[in-house]
Regions:
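Local cysteine-cluster metal-coordination motifs and their immediate loop/turn environment
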Residues: 85-93, 155-168, 190-204, 220-233
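Catalytic cores of enzyme domains
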Residues: 29-181
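Short, amphipathic alpha-helical interaction segments positioned at domain boundaries
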Residues: 2-38
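Beta-sheet entry/capping signal
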Residues: 3, 81-82, 213
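Ferredoxin-like iron-sulfur electron-transfer modules
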Residues: 145-152, 172-201, 205-223
Length: 234
């Protein structure tokens, strides 16, 4: 509901545990998911994704503007904790794809990750907002991550892409790991020049080209908005 409330002891305990063990958890889940994808065992993947979505953090895809608004909201705190560190998926799987330092952690999430990993560095609210705008230019989708399907225990703004991001790949395989945000893209077909840039930038294959004009399948759109700033038809 947009209100700031004190973090409970259980929230902090869960986040501290997950922060310390996230690389190991990601490696195990990545190997397990790959194994069952190879077997084409969709019923098992369905159960696995629901379990992951229940006991592990889940993501809500949002626009960069909403992520920046959230930074402004938490900036009213007496001590605003914001930090940035390595992409945990890249760190855990020892792979690199694009920007490495892009995991923005906030409030008690910032405290937990700074304690667990020396790579995490403090950010001012203005620095965090500038980074989010930079990530948008790179085509990364901002995603609010919260614990235990709470939707309110937000501890991180991940900036995800599809090649290595484990939650994204797990969601593509079985669902129930990432959720669409409150926005969807609206297209004015009269202004579209058919360049196809939005198709290349869309992570969810919501944009397609038909008779030289882009079409948006809004049921597939998760509302990240990364296709908007590069639209040549404006």
């Amino acid at each position: 509901n947009g209100k700031l409330v004190p973090a409970s002891r259980i929230q902090v305990t869960i986040d501290n545990f997950y922060a310390r063990n996230e690389p190991m958890i990601l490696r195990v889940l990545d190997a397990t998911t790959r194994f069952f994808v190879k077997l084409r065992a969709r019923p098992v993947l369905w159960v696995l994704s629901r379990l992951m979505g229940t006991v592990l953090p889940t993501g809500e895809v949002v626009t960069t503007e909403r992520a920046i608004d959230f930074i402004d909201t938490i900036s009213v705190l007496d001590k605003t904790e914001i930090a940035v560190g390595p992409c945990m998926c890249q760190k855990a799987l020892q792979k690199r794809s694009g920007t490495y330092i892009k995991d923005v952690v906030i409030i008690y999430g910032a405290e937990a990750y700074k304690m667990a990993y020396p790579e995490y560095k403090d950010l001012s609210p203005d620095e965090a907002k500038a980074l989010l705008r930079k990530f948008q230019e790179e085509g990364l989708m901002p995603t609010f991550y919260s614990c235990l399907r709470s939707g309110g225990w937000i501890y991180a703004i991940c900036n995800c892409e599809g090649k290595i991001c484990f939650p994204f790949r797990a969601h593509q395989a079985a669902g129930a790991v990432m959720y669409p945000g409150p926005d969807v893209v609206s297209l004015n077909s009269d202004e579209c020049i058919g360049c196809g840039t939005c198709i290349d930038r869309c992570h969810f294959s919501a944009n397609t080209l038909f008779n030289g004009t882009c079409k948006v399948e809004q049921t597939k759109c998760y509302g990240c908005g990364v296709c908007i700033p590069t639209c040549k038809g404006q």
